[in-house]
Regions:
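Cys/His-rich, Zn2+-coordinating zinc-finger modules
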Residues: 3-12, 16-23, 28, 44-98
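Canonical RING-type zinc finger of E3 ubiquitin-protein ligases
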Residues: 30-39
Length: 98
């Protein structure tokens, strides 16, 4: 079923639990707003509302297409190349949000 969502959805990578910090912001002494996790390599980085937009930079630099929120109270995923927002479908799967 997930193949129909987009060709990038199933990454074949089992992401570890996300970290509680943006790994790149910590290196440069900056701050972040929300955190995202790459579903292709597991790196935890900051969102586009953060000053440095590290997750989008990561996507552009290495081409990893899928990320998810790393916020503890949220559950969604984003595909960069297809610009698709995925949410849980209520049956243990995923659906494209309208």
């Amino acid at each position: 079923m997930t193949e129909a969502l987009c060709p990038h959805f199933d990454t074949g990578f089992e992401a570890p639990p996300p970290k509680a910090v943006c790994e790149e912001c910590v290196k440069i002494g900056s701050h972040w707003f929300h955190l995202r996790q790459c579903l292709n390599c597991g790196q935890t980085l900051c969102c586009d509302q953060s000053p440095n937009k590290h997750m989008t930079g990561h996507n552009r630099a290495v081409g990893h297409p899928m990320m998810r929120t790393a916020q503890p109270d949220e559950e969604w995923r984003w595909c960069y190349p297809d610009e698709l927002f995925f949410i849980p479908d209520g049956d243990g799967g995923w659906e494209v949000a309208e």
